[in-house]
């Protein structure tokens, strides 16, 4: 039985999204038990109304809610009995294998980092997310906003934890291909930080394929793409905006005149397939990667379907025992990085 902790009060709409999303998820997974944190009276009423299988749900009452615009340090210091904090605590205490929240991103990252700590050798956790491609391939992108300014060593650490996660979830694919997001594919391109990161990764034990431009990411050329949080967040928002723009443009074009409306009827199966493939809700659920516990961040403005997919992400990670596999692989990879760094420093010193 897989047990997940759910922050039922988090997100823009709270219970209106988390409860139906959790109910649909439980109906699809008879091997899951949920610990839902929040106001017990409100939560029980909402679950009953949704027809949730109460025999597989424990309610953990909390008296506080972290606001979506609340400062992370304030939430950490003053909201120790919040639905978010208590959900993360379930993972720390071994009562749940993963926690899911649609709440304040900064507060969740601060809380998870404080409660769970980072994997030994990993300085900072990163926000990671699987992105679609033009094939059935998916690519893990990180960091998507947690760390806007990174050292080469930290970027290399992101590459390590990203590679280990993909390998844990998809061992049949072999060693994941790792790409470094840059303004060009040549190793002379980019900032000093990116150039130094390139050299570290080149001498590591990772399957480093070199620099990758953002316009290639959705073509499945890499299994893991690494960037600092500033570049990664801009990249993600650009992709999301482009998908939304194209979807709207196609819809408006097919509705513009009678001929196009008739053409839309003929193209309906293909359009439905495209819509399903690009549905952002299917890729909801960012991973706070690098922690000694599985924490999934759902988009705060998602609907019940999107929240269900965030629970799916937590479920798959918990079921694959990804965390223990990551921790085992990280030590070896980080040792190789230290060797690469020493060689790099020696070469610089010899100039």
From Swiss-Prot:
Matching InterPro entries: FA_synthesis, Phospholipid_synth_PlsX-like
Gene3D superfamilies: Isopropylmalate Dehydrogenase (3.40.718.10)
Locations listed in the record: Cytoplasm
GO CC annotation terms, alphabetical: cytoplasm
Keywords: Cytoplasm, Lipid biosynthesis, Lipid metabolism, Phospholipid biosynthesis, Phospholipid metabolism, Transferase
Pfam families the UniProt entry points to: FA_synthesis
Protein purpose: Catalyzes the reversible formation of acyl-phosphate (acyl-PO(4)) from acyl-[acyl-carrier-protein] (acyl-ACP). This enzyme utilizes acyl-ACP as fatty acyl donor, but not acyl-CoA.
HAMAP family to which the protein is assigned, alphabetical: PlsX
Subunit structure: Homodimer. Probably interacts with PlsY.
Sequence similarity: Belongs to the PlsX family.
Name of this chain's protein: Phosphate acyltransferase
Naturally occurring in which organism (per UniProt): Neisseria meningitidis serogroup A / serotype 4A (strain DSM 15465 / Z2491)
UniProt gene name: plsX
